[in-house]
Curated annotation (Swiss-Prot):
Domain Helicase ATP-binding: 861-1038
Single GO MF annotation: ATP binding
GO cellular component term, pick one: cytoplasm
Role summary: Catalyzes DNA unwinding and is involved in telomerase-independent telomere maintenance.
Name the UniProt record assigns to this protein: Y' element ATP-dependent helicase protein 1 copy 3
The EC number(s) this enzyme carries: 5.6.2.-
Cysteines engaged in disulfide bonds, as pairs: none
Biased composition (Low complexity): 1318-1461
Record keyword ATP-binding present: yes
Location of the Helicase C-terminal domain: 1095-1244
InterPro entries the record matches: DEAD/DEAH_box_helicase_dom, Helicase_ATP-bd, Helicase_C-like, ORC1-binding_dom, P-loop_NTPase, Sir1_ORC-binding, Y'_ATP-dependent_helicase
Length: 1859
């Protein structure tokens, strides 16, 4: 029997072997490789090339095959291919699974065409509605013909839908996971084809459902967390005994990850009625509760406040299994085992899952290029499944807690059955996870390490990783050091951390009492904290928004390497949440400094709840220094850069908000500030802690030399193994030491009892000191083994003592005794006399010359000589400022040494003026000295400016005393030195008796620390100067007087500046000229000083409207009274000593810079140092002025002018106060000045009077002319007995109306402008005395004047007949006295408006000629309508009296009545004398007109000051504050009126400059850039910052300003700073490319390399493609702009045959290109002519550059070996760029692929960007526009696999990357 059985088995085996051979033969016949290139698979011919398989057409390729292959395939059956070829649908079904397994698949979108009913593929030309209806399929592409492509999709043969759901083979994994089948039974979850169509909605809108799930969970959690405290708890896998609260505290990032994990299951819930897996629920009986999915979809929309009440009720019903709702939750929980594709990235553990399981989905992943997955993957891994269940539990607990009365359903003992089942599922999954997490770890003694899952992990691995992170930290630090003087890590460690004077003794967590709101920063003395902050470098601009952003980004980036350094330095690893929550302050603080070892110690908890005892881990010295540096320096820099308005962080439950009475009222700004001052590792850009996704990126690249990289979990297990096996114990208590190591690694010793032989151990089982000691020993062992201390060299003997660093501050005693220093000979930097000349050219231009030889020699003396102290006396207006300004600029140009100088002035009002003057042209960085006193030297400022009080302050003295030590610590160099100490008007030290007590502190200043001291004054003779210098502690003047020509260098400077006599240079004596001779000085005794002063001011402003004046009053009360009474006449600024310092500075600056301010009123403090160009008059009302104050006041008139000293008659009895100089005396002012300066007296001699006592011989021509004009005006006023009140009228009227003619008139609006201006200028003065100019103007501009004059004297009937049809008699008489031109003007245009203007401008001469030559008929007519008196006067004789009567009666009132009713006579209501009005009466009767004119004038001056026009090239970018080099590349060329949409700033019939009525015109004479043009450019700037939709909304928002460009400019200027910052931020990349020419490399664009073949092409290939495209366009005569706009290949032969630009544009307009462009694209947001005018002269520079490059293109074609073809001419090239600019689809893809560029919204910027060069894949340079054309071609190419790119998916991916 046994033999028979064996024979039977042998026969069966032979049969099976034979069958197997037959099957193999059959398969070989069906799938036969017939050659090296082709394969036959199921009716298709597949071509193999480079391991790529492609379906081809046999008929096309048969001639390319071998003869034997062709014979074999001729017999093959290609019916399947023929079927696909003949199918009209783009999507063709294919049942061959072998084909889909052999050929790469892709995902494409398809839609059903409504017209034909065919299935078509989605292309870029597909409409939006078809896209919305599209669906995705996994397909294989087939080229069935030339440019004909079909797509095969797998469909099984005749599926039987009646037999039930189709088992999904995509859910059967290759590696069986028993748990998901036995516990979750995933094999029973079967989906039919309808289900897959429904599930495709989820993949198409995954982002939406991610957001929906997150919002729902967030809302539920907020409501659940607000419930009153509930005592119920639930047991967890990690805390199975005591349990945790049911509603656990979750971070917002955790809620977001949970929400993303829940997205597929939320989708299932919302579609329970459609999916077949819920068949049990769908079979519910009538009356049972159903889920209203439509209501759920409405309530849970993430775009609005989420309403979760109904959702909460559904969740409660599912938990309680009401009706059949429990079946829904049951299915959803089982579906958790399914992998619905790529979930949220960035969670801790994702990478471990991929590494551990090595799972591969059945369907090849097509998610690598950002494409959506439309099929389910293999089941979830245990770890991912556990995370999903975590999310489900959180959602169920939170949602049920929203409406449930209590949470008993979640009770461990009495809870509902559903919850118990969930707990069982979770526990089983957790146990499975523990099994999966077991790592294969083996010891590798040879390499001093271990093997983790076959990957070597040893000390070299850790050290390589650590020092790579340290190098990354240092590199980022260097970037900051380029902009700042950054202290090094060693500097800060030596100065503070290692300094034993700084104590860090404080209680710590787990050892002593815990203190809230503590930080080790509070333990650092303030004097150290002030000097650790870095200072800006000299070559760096001020803290701009771009620089602040650079600081925050750099510090965010270096946070991650620091985290890794800590991770490796502690040795016993952290879980990521523990590392993430390290805090150096606040209630969750866990970072401390050990006072003994000066190392950083970390106290962290085992889990997030902090339920276990803290673990102590000590860092090594090197890492401690870096952590300390990060907290004390870098974080403080980051806080300063972010500013007080930073509010990116939101309140999160994990965050303890302390210090607020009501935490619910805490704003995001408060939260952000708490976080910045507490937590270490932040992502300030996103407003969150550093995410795991960012942290783990380093694992993929580091260490560089490791062949295999470990993931985070493997690395954690490897660190634990290293601690166990490689780091040995050296103590007697080995058991405790080993157990401590396990606890520090966050392991429970209970889990290792088999290893250690103990059942339990915790640090509470030993004393607190022992616990600390054990943990410190464990850290010490790790540090010693890793060897970080051997790389850390901290030589305390070589580092400076902290006492030396702050010696200056410590040495300052209560008595402020001066610090004695050892003076030395100062090192000299190479200087040249040419430096001063270069500095002058920088400041004043290339034509700079010195005033005289004295000024040149003094500048050289100050700059070149070794004289330590110099005093200069020069007359006011000489240019004393330039004596130190030019040397300061020369010092600043020295790159090897940084000089910091100080300037002090006597009064606060001089600060603003000095800073404006000294900072012009950007030659010096100037700042207030207060900044230096409060913050120290910033490393950028060249000159600090302050007042005498600052010079005398203790803080300033102390900072100067400690200068060298602090600078060496802060800037790590000795090349930052103190430069000049400059004191202006130093005579005040002696003359200001009442302030001498304030100057006492100056004597404590260490003058020896400065390079040189310079003392300047215009009123300091030798006696005053010597006394002033001695009063501040200096030696005084040199005993031997020095001449300016003596430029000997002192050889011995060892005594120091303070003990060296000051050398005096007295330019007044040298020149022997009396100062102030250029000013006309007048002494007047008057009855009323204010009244006389007002007369003088009004007269000055009538003559010189743009001039300014200063009035010096005697008391503060008088200052305020004058300001109140004069402000109705002109704009006034007043200042006196009772105002605050800031207010004084602000008002002085306003007067100097605001051109509309006329008068500065103040006490004598306004007489010193102020330089005002328009100043023409100084009036002094102070009776107590001494000679110094007089000279200083008159000295403000730099270029000449008038000075009036007004005193009351018989009241000059002022006495000098004790110790002060006596007041000036009555008499010759020049002689008193000579006496003061010690000049030779000329009393009684020739030349005694210089600019005084009526002498004009030494005055300038302009000053003499001004005096004469003032005298003439005074005589005129005296003759007419004019009142003071009337004086401003002419001045105001001329400004408001007469000037309008100069700049408001235009050709099309000339008549209206003339008439309006004529009416406005009607007044008594004009009529009473008509000058020749007016008459000529009237006769030339319009000859209707004469006619209207006749009509005034004629009845209404006559006037009408004349206007409508002038009879022969009247016309003849008129033409006799009027030229032919006048007659023509009358006959052609006679209107009411003309009559008005004529009536008001009739001259006496015209009236006489008209009256004497009017025909008898007319005279009779006139007589009949004229009063007897007038008739007699007129008819009897035309004499002067009659003329005067006629002229005087022509006034505003008469004109109005004449125009209203022509029947009324001009002199009807009285005789001529009664109608003669005085000018004052006339103005008073027209108060409304005068007020209106005043308002226009005031508005005009305000606008002129606010929007100055300095040149014709002025643009709005200058107004925003951009530098010239930035404006060059952001310049808004091509922006004109056509840029504005129709109706925006385009009104007609108004002033072209301001779009206002001509009588309200606010334009000013000489304005070079109109307000309307500035408004166009401002609108363009707003367009720069907005996309199309945002710009549309913006145009709607500014609709009130569409007709008011001036109002819009005001609205725009309010956001000036914000707009500037936004442009700097949004266009930083653009400026980097266009201005700094940073290179764009396609290889740096990851998305480009993955998503486009163009980015993998060489430069040669791109150029060939570019030339090929243009060759094709030229051959086909395709319309270029339309083609690049939307790939429409319309013909336009005229475009290619056009000879010039005009014909070219006409051709485009003829075919309707511009019209289509406006209707289809964003070009509709501009004017109708905007695009058309781009072909004119807007882009001349770019055109010239392009035409010069045509030769280069020809050479390129020859080099490429292609036939030279014509490259496009300029107009075609510009058409291409405009088309690409308006092609939204193309631009979206280009911006997605080319990561170095972003969006631009202005065509000029696009054109500039297109012409930059990029590096192709082979590092050859090509213009960007060639790359653009290649990408454009790829988008239109169906034969490029990656050519068709879904823009919606592009944007989703970019948003995901951004998040």
């Amino acid at each position: 029997m046994e033999i028979e059985n064996e024979q039977i088995c042998t026969c069966i085996a032979q049969i099976l072997h034979l069958l197997n051979s037959l099957i193999i033969t059959f398969l070989d016949d069906d799938k036969t490789e017939t050659g090296q290139s082709f394969v036959y698979i199921d009716g298709f011919l597949v071509k193999k090339h480079n391991n790529q398989h492609t379906i081809v057409n046999f008929e096309t390729y048969k001639n390319k095959m071998k003869v034997s292959d062709r014979r074999k395939f001729e017999k093959a059956n290609f019916d399947e291919f023929e079927s696909a070829l003949n199918n009209k649908n783009d999507l063709v079904h294919c049942p061959s699974i072998t084909l889909f397994e052999s050929i790469p698949t892709e995902v494409r979108s398809f839609y059903e065409d409504e017209k034909s009913g065919l299935i078509k593929v989605v292309k870029f030309r597909t409409g939006a509605m078809d896209r919305k209806r599209s669906f995705e399929k996994i397909v294989v592409s087939v080229m069935v013909g030339k440019n004909v492509q079909k797509f095969l999709t797998f469909v099984e043969d005749e599926p039987d839908f009646q037999g039930g759901p189709i088992p999904s083979k995509y859910l059967i994994p290759k590696k069986i996971n028993l748990m998901v089948y036995t516990l979750f039974q995933v094999h029973t979850l079967k989906f039919n084809r309808k289900d897959y169509d429904t599930l495709s909605l989820f993949y198409l809108n995954r982002g939406y459902y991610n957001e929906l799930s997150f919002r729902v969970l967030e809302r539920c959690y907020e409501i659940a967390s607000a419930r009153p405290n509930d005592s119920s708890t639930m047991r967890t896998f990690t805390d199975f005994v005591s349990g945790t609260p049911i509603v656990r505290g979750l971070q917002k990032s955790t809620i977001r990850k949970y929400g993303y994990n829940l997205a597929p299951y939320m989708f299932l819930l919302l579609h329970v009625d459609e999916l077949s897996i819920f068949s049990a629920y769908q079979a519910s009986l009538p009356g049972e509760k159903k889920v209203d999915t439509e209501r759920l979809k409405r309530d849970l929309c993430p775009r609005k406040p989420t309403e979760i009440k109904y959702f909460s009720q559904i969740c409660n019903d599912m938990m309680n299994k009401k009706d059949r709702l429990g079946d829904i939750l049951h299915i959803i929980l089982r579906a958790c085992a399914l992998n619905f594709g790529a979930g949220p990235r960035g969670g801790a553990g994702d990478e471990e899952d991929r590494s551990i399981t090595n799972e591969e989905p059945i369907i090849p992943s097509v998610d690598e290029h950002g494409l959506k997955v439309c099929k389910l993957r293999s089941p979830n891994t245990p770890r991912r499944l556990r995370k999903t269940l975590d999310a489900v539990k959180a959602l169920l607990v939170s949602s049920c807690a929203c409406t449930a009365r209590d949470l008993d359903i979640f009770d461990d003992n009495n809870g509902v059955a559903m919850w118990k089942w969930i707990k069982i599922l979770y526990h089983e999954v957790a146990q499975e996870t523990a099994l999966k997490d077991s790592y294969r770890i083996t010891l590798v003694p040879s390499s001093d390490g271990v093997s983790v899952c076959g990957k070597l992990f040893n000390r070299e691995y850790v050290r390589g990783f650590y020092f790579a992170c340290k190098a990354q930290f240092d590199n980022l630090w260097e970037e900051l050091n380029d902009c700042f003087y950054m202290p090094t890590v060693v500097d800060i460690a030596s100065l503070i951390l290692r300094n034993r004077e700084v104590l860090f003794r404080e209680p710590k967590r787990g050892i002593d009492e815990y203190l809230e709101n503590d930080s080790f920063l509070q333990m650092i003395p303030v004097k150290y904290r002030e000097i650790v902050l870095p200072k800006l470098r000299r070559d760096t601009n001020k803290m701009t928004a771009a620089l602040k952003n650079k600081v925050t980004v750099a510090i965010d980036e270096l946070t991650v390497p620091l985290m890794w350094m800590i991770h490796f330095a502690v040795g016993y690893p952290y879980r990521y949440p523990e590392l993430q929550l390290l805090a150096f302050a606040g209630p969750q603080r866990n970072v401390y400094v050990d006072d003994t070892t000066r190392r950083i110690q970390l106290y962290t908890d085992y889990n997030k709840n902090g339920s276990s005892e803290p673990r102590l881990k000590t860092l090594d010295g090197l890492t401690s220094d870096y952590v300390f540096y990060f907290v004390t320096v870098l974080r403080q820099m980051q806080i300063c850069a972010l500013g007080n308005s930073y509010d990116a962080f939101n309140h999160d439950p994990w965050m303890d908000v302390v210090g607020f009475e009501d935490p619910d009222q805490v704003t995001n700004r408060d939260i952000s500030r708490i976080v910045l001052y507490s937590y270490m590792f932040l992502n300030t850009a996103k407003g969150c802690l550093v995410e795991y996704a960012t942290f783990r990126q380093y694992m993929r690249e580091l260490p560089k030399n490791a062949p295999q990289k470990l993931n985070f979990r493997e690395m954690r297990q490897g660190l634990i193994a290293l601690g166990r096996h490689c780091v040995g114990s050296r103590f007697e208590t080995d058991l405790y030491e080993s157990a401590t190591s396990e606890l520090m690694a966050n392991h429970s010793v209970q889990t290792g009892r088999n290893i250690y032989g103990v059942d339990s151990f915790s640090l509470t089982s030993v004393s607190g000191t022992t616990a600390t000691l054990l943990q410190e020993r464990a850290s010490e062992r790790w540090i010693q083994w890793l060897g970080l201390e051997s790389d850390y060299h901290c030589s305390f003997s070589s580092t400076r003592n902290a006492e030396d660093v702050v010696a200056g501050e410590a040495a300052s005693s209560d008595h402020h005794q001066k610090i004695s220093r050892v003076t030395r000979k100062r090192p000299r930097e190479p200087k040249s006399t040419n430096d001063i000349l270069v500095a002058g050219q920088k400041l004043f231009g290339s034509s700079f010359e010195f005033r005289d030889l004295h000024q040149l020699r003094l500048c050289h003396e100050i700059y070149m000589a070794d004289t330590p102290s110099v005093a200069v006396q020069a007359p006011p207006g000489y240019g004393k400022t330039e004596l130190f300004h030019l040397p300061l600029i020369a010092l600043a140009s020295k790159g090897d040494v940084k000089y910091v100088s100080f300037l002090f002035v006597p009064y606060t009002v001089l600060l603003a003026n000095c800073m404006i003057r000294l900072s012009r042209c950007g030659c010096l960085n100037v700042a207030p000295v207060r900044n230096f006193i409060e913050e120290g030297c910033d490393g950028v400022t060249d000159l600090y400016v302050g007042i005498y009080d600052d010079l005398a302050s203790t803080n300033f003295t102390d900072r100067i005393a400690a200068w060298e030590n602090i600078v060496e610590c802060t800037f790590r160099t000795n090349n930052v030195k103190l430069g000049y100490l400059i004191v202006d008007e130093f005579h005040n030290f002696e003359t200001e008796v009442y302030r001498q007590s304030q100057f006492g502190g100056i004597t404590n200043l260490d003058f020896d620390a400065f390079e040189k001291a310079i003392f300047l004054s215009g009123t300091a003779p030798e006696a005053v100067a010597d006394a002033a210098l001695q009063r501040i502690g200096l030696t005084g003047l040199a005993k031997k007087s020095m001449d300016i020509n003596e430029l000997k260098r002192s050889e011995d400077l060892s005594r120091g500046l303070s003990s060296y006599p000051t050398r005096m240079f007295n330019l007044i004596k040298e020149k022997s000229e009396v100062p102030l001779g250029h000013v006309h000085k007048i002494w007047k005794k008057v009855e009323s000083q204010p009244e006389e002063a007002l007369k003088l001011l009004l007269a000055l402003f009538e003559i010189e409207p743009e001039s300014k004046a200063i009035v010096v009053a005697s008391t503060t009360n008088e200052v305020e009274e004058l300001a109140c009474s004069w402000r109705k006449y002109f704009r006034v600024v007043w200042i006196h000593g009772k105002l605050g310092a800031a207010e004084k500075v602000s008002r002085t600056k306003e007067f100097v810079t605001d051109g509309s301010m006329r008068v500065l009123i103040g006490t004598k403090l306004v007489t010193e140092g102020i330089d005002i160009k328009q100043l023409m008059m100084v009036i002094m009302l102070d009776n107590r002025l001494n000679i110094i104050e007089l000279i200083q006041g008159v000295g403000r008139l730099r270029d000449g002018g008038l000075c009036y000293l007004l005193s009351r008659k018989n009241s000059w009895a002022a006495r000098n106060r004790k110790g002060e100089l006596p007041p000036i005396k009555e008499g010759c002012i020049t002689e008193q000045v000579r006496e003061f300066y010690g000049l030779e007296s000329k009393k009684g001699k020739k030349g005694q009077h210089v600019g005084c006592c009526g002498s004009r011989t030494d005055l300038s021509a302009d000053t003499v002319e001004l005096i004469e004009r003032m005298d003439r005006l005074a005589e005129k006023q005296a003759t007419a007995s004019m009142s003071i009140v009337a004086l401003p009228s002419s001045f105001q009227e001329s400004n408001s109306s007469d000037r309008c003619r100069k700049y408001c008139s235009s050709d099309e609006d000339s008549d209206t402008c003339i008439h309006g201006s004529a009416n406005a200028s009607t007044n008594a003065t004009t009529n009473s005395s008509t000058n020749a100019t007016t008459t000529a103007s009237t006769n030339v501009r319009t000859s209707a004047t004469t006619t209207a004059s006749i009509n005034v004297r004629t009845s209404a009937t006559t006037t009408e007949s004349t206007n409508s049809s002038t009879n022969a008699t009247t016309t003849a008489s008129t033409n006799v006295r009027t030229s032919a031109t006048t007659t023509a003007s009358i006959n052609v245009r006679t209107s009411a408006t003309t009559t008005e203007s004529t009536n008001s401008n009739t001259s006496a001469t015209t009236t006489e000629s008209t009256d004497s030559n009017t025909s008898a008929t007319t005279t009779e007519s006139t007589d009949s309508n004229t009063s007897a008196t007038t008739t007699a006067s007129t008819n009897s004789s035309t004499n002067a009296t009659t003329t005067a009567s006629t002229n005087s009666s022509t006034n505003a009132t008469t004109t109005e009545s004449t125009n209203a009713s022509a029947k009324e006579d001009a002199n009807k209501d009285g005789n001529a004398e009664d109608n003669r009005f005085h000018p004052v009466t006339d103005i008073n009767k027209e108060s409304y007109k005068r007020k209106g004119s005043q308002m226009v004038l005031l508005e005009r001056k305000k606008l002129k000051a606010q929007f100055p026009n300095t040149s014709e090239n002025m643009n709005v970018l200058q107004f925003l504050g951009f530098r010239s080099d930035e404006i060059k590349h952001l310049f808004l060329y091509g922006i004109d009126v056509y840029f504005c949409p129709e109706g925006v700033f385009t009104q007609y019939g108004l002033c072209k400059g301001c779009q206002k009525m001509f009588e309200l015109c606010v334009c000013w004479a000489g304005q070079k850039v109109s307000y309307r043009r500035m408004a166009w450019e401002a609108l363009a700037v707003e367009r720069m910052l907005r996309n199309d939709e945002e710009y549309k909304e913006y145009l709607e928002d500014i609709e009130p300003y569409h007709g008011d460009p001036v109002g819009y400019l005001k609205y725009f200027s309010v956001k000036r700073g914000e707009i500037y910052s936004q442009i700097q931020r949004n266009y930083a990349w653009y400026l980097a490319i266009t201005r700094r020419r940073e290179t764009i490399s396609v290889l740096d664009s990851t998305r480009g390399k993955q998503g486009s073949q163009v980015f993998r092409m060489s430069g040669r290939q791109i150029k060939e493609l570019y030339y090929k495209v243009w060759s094709n366009l030229r051959e086909s005569k395709t319309e270029v702009l339309q083609y690049f706009l939307n790939w429409d290949e319309k013909k336009c032969r005229e475009e290619w045959e056009a000879k010039d630009d005009t014909v070219f544009v006409e051709a485009l307009e003829k075919v309707g290109v511009f019209q289509r462009l406006r209707s289809m694209t964003s070009a509709g947001l501009q004017g109708p002519q905007y695009v058309k005018l781009q072909f004119s002269r807007h882009h001349r520079q770019l055109r010239s550059r392009y035409e010069l490059s045509l030769g280069m293109h020809l050479r390129d074609q020859l080099a490429l070996g292609v036939t030279p073809s014509k490259v496009p001419h300029w107009t075609a090239f510009l058409s291409m760029l405009i088309g690409l600019f308006c092609n939204k689809t193309f631009r979206q893809k280009l911006e997605y692929l080319l990561e170095q560029i972003s969006e631009v919204w202005l065509l000029p910027h696009w054109l500039d960007l297109a012409n930059v060069e990029v590096l192709a894949a082979d590092n050859t340079r090509v213009p960007l526009y060639m790359l653009m054309v290649a990408v454009h071609k790829e988008l239109d190419s169906d034969d490029v696999p990656d050519g068709r790119f879904d823009i919606l998916l592009c944007r989703d991916s970019s948003r995901e990357v951004g998040e």
